[in-house]
């Protein structure tokens, strides 16, 4: 048997360090067993998926040195490798489940589903809806079908008992069927959900080992049941521990930068980032901290993965990156790294239009453009003394903008402008006044190049990191304030 593993990211935003972490372990496991590593794109979310995000994923993984044997850009015998191009395949297998009685069409409206869940909640039952809960009288089903109501295809699941799933790291995992819902397999637009698409794709692509984050453990019974319905052999499962913040909370872009693009923009070396990700819950047999990707692949043993919840510590990564710079880069290599980092034509050409109208001598460039070549600006609370806002309003403005930017999938100036305008109107402020503290937070100065252009060039994670830094410099948001801010933010009609 040839070992075949895969990574299947969704192109809905910046490439996440968690994606790179799971990809690294899949790659090392495959190479350790002389196998193949596949990259598949889960782009069934038609609203949020973008070609730009897909390209960023490919570029980021390659930057880290993670190469795949088959994928949307390199091809292979099991394509297409984008789920959006495999719709007919999923429809065929969904129909097979319907014909065999393992799935059913559900015409329930969202309002009816809410009522059913509320009824189960009031009765003290699991909120998972079963086929019996969703059933309609035959004549009502016939009427909705005749009137062409929208429907989804759901899988049938047992109402009682438990499902036992084997895991490479955790042994046998038992999940009560009572907490497993009649999962949607095909959405009303005909696109598959994760559950159907992944089972079908993993089988057709010959995936032998599914190594993914532990957040998918509760979905494993659905996948096992689908393999049984199709009468297919199930791949070996391995649920990896999730990356954690230093406070042990789940790694989240709300607390820390999570984009590979951020670390690349900050000037981290790809070999240092890959090395550090390799230390997430795993160690070399001799426990050394610094090792190459080739050394990790040669010594990889999945049983050495610890389930304790690896901590992604930025200070530790920064230390390791410094070791690489000092020990591995001579002057020529360091100069080349600087060019690749920021002093390259592609990046500088984005900045030149911002500074050209404002300079008289070449030495004027760095004071105007220094924020494009640095991490977070060296701010103090006094940096905001010229902002004529109450302290809490200032914190709220920066926090609301940070949250607003988390939802931006197309990071371009026109989109950012619309979002900032919407928030400025919600605060009943003119754009100039609203942007004044944002200028300082993002560029480190009250006067600089266009802050919206700067945000577009710096990227989403770097921009949000600078906004979070400004909030911290101003004393931070207390837990009490955070709760109030979140409530107010949800109530905003923007």
From Swiss-Prot:
Instruction: Indicate which residues form the motif 'KMSKS' region.
Output: 250-254
- Pfam families found in the cross-reference section: Anticodon_2, tRNA-synt_1c
**Gene3D superfamilies from the xrefs?**
1.10.10.350, HUPs
Q: Where in the cell is it found?
A: Cytoplasm
| Catalysed transformations (reactions) | tRNA(Glu) + L-glutamate + ATP = L-glutamyl-tRNA(Glu) + AMP + diphosphate
Gene Ontology process terms (BP)? glutamyl-tRNA aminoacylation
What's one GO MF term for it? Answer: glutamate-tRNA ligase activity
Q: Which SUPFAM superfamilies match?
A: An anticodon-binding domain of class I aminoacyl-tRNA synthetases (SSF48163), Nucleotidylyl transferase (SSF52374)
Main localization (coarse): cytoplasm
UniProt short sequence motif 'HIGH' region, positions renumbered to this chain: 9-19
This enzyme's EC code(s):
6.1.1.17
Keyword Cell membrane appears in the UniProt entry: no
The UniProt keywords, alphabetically, are: Aminoacyl-tRNA synthetase, ATP-binding, Cytoplasm, Ligase, Nucleotide-binding, Protein biosynthesis
InterPro entries attached here? aa-tRNA-synth_I_cd-bd (IPR045462), aa-tRNA-synth_I_codon-bd_sub2 (IPR020751), aa-tRNA-synth_I_CS (IPR001412), aa_tRNA-synth_I_cd-bd_sf (IPR008925), Glu-tRNA-ligase_bac/mito (IPR004527), Glu/Gln-tRNA-synth (IPR000924), Glu/Gln-tRNA-synth_Ib_cat-dom (IPR020058), GluQ/Sye (IPR049940)
Q: Where does ATP bind?
A: 253
Q: Which GO terms describe its cellular component?
A: cytosol
Functionally, this protein is described as follows: Catalyzes the attachment of glutamate to tRNA(Glu) in a two-step reaction: glutamate is first activated by ATP to form Glu-AMP and then transferred to the acceptor end of tRNA(Glu).
Q: Which HAMAP family match?
A: Glu_tRNA_synth_type1
**Binding partners and assembly:** Monomer.
Please give the name of this protein.
Glutamate--tRNA ligase
The record lists the organism as: Chromohalobacter salexigens (strain ATCC BAA-138 / DSM 3043 / CIP 106854 / NCIMB 13768 / 1H11)
Gene name of the encoded protein = gltX
């Amino acid at each position: 048997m040839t070992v075949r593993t895969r990574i299947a990211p969704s192109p809905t935003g910046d490439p996440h360090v968690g994606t790179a972490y799971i990809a690294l372990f899949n790659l090392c496991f495959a190479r350790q067993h002389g196998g193949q590593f596949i990259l598949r794109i889960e782009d069934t979310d038609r609203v949020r998926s973008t070609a730009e995000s897909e390209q960023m994923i490919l570029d980021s993984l390659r930057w880290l040195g993670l190469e795949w044997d088959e994928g949307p850009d390199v091809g292979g015998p099991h394509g297409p490798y984008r789920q959006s191009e495999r719709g007919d395949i999923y429809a065929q297998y969904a129909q097979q489940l319907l014909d065999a009685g393992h799935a059913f069409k559900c015409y329930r409206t969202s309002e009816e589903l809410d009522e059913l869940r509320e009824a189960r909640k009031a009765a003290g039952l699991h909120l998972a809806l079963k086929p019996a809960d969703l059933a309609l009288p035959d004549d009502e089903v016939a009427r909705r079908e005749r009137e062409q109501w929208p429907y989804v295809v759901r899988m049938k699941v047992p109402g009682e008992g438990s499902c036992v799933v084997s895991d490479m790291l955790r042994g046998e995992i038992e999940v009560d069927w009572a907490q497993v819902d009649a999962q949607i397999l095909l959405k009303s637009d005909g696109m598959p959900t994760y559950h159907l698409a992944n089972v079908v794709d993993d089988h057709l692509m010959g995936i032998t080992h599914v190594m993914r984050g532990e957040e998918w453990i509760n979905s494993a019974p659905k996948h096992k049941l689908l393999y049984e319905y199709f009468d297919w052999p199930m791949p070996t499962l391995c649920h990896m521990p999730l990356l954690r913040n230093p406070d042990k909370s789940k790694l989240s872009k709300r607390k820390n930068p999570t984009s590979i693009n951020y670390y690349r923009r900050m000037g981290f070396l790809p070999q240092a980032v890959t090395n550090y990700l390799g230390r997430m819950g795993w160690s070399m047999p001799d426990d050394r901290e610094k090792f190459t990707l080739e050394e990790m692949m040669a010594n990889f043993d999945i049983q050495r993965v610890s389930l304790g919840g690896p901590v992604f510590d930025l200070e530790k990564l920064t230390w390791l990156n410094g070791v690489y710079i000092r020990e591995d880069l001579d002057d020529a290599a360091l100069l080349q790294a600087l060019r690749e980092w920021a002093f390259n034509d592609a990046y500088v050409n984005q900045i030149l239009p911002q500074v050209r109208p404002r300079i008289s001598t070449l030495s004027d460039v760095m004071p105007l453009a220094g924020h494009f070549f640095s991490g977070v600006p060296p701010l103090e609370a006094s940096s905001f003394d010229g902002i004529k806002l109450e302290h809490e309003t200032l914190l709220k403005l920066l926090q609301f903008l940070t949250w607003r930017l988390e939802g931006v999938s197309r990071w371009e100036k026109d989109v950012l402008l619309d979002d900032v305008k919407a928030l400025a109107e919600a605060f009943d402020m003119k754009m100039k006044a609203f942007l004044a503290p944002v200028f300082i937070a993002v560029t480190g100065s009250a006067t600089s190049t266009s802050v919206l252009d700067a945000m577009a060039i710096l990227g989403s994670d770097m921009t949000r990191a600078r906004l979070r830094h400004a909030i911290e410099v101003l004393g931070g948001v207390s837990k009490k304030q955070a709760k109030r801010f979140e409530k107010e933010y949800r109530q905003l009609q923007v």
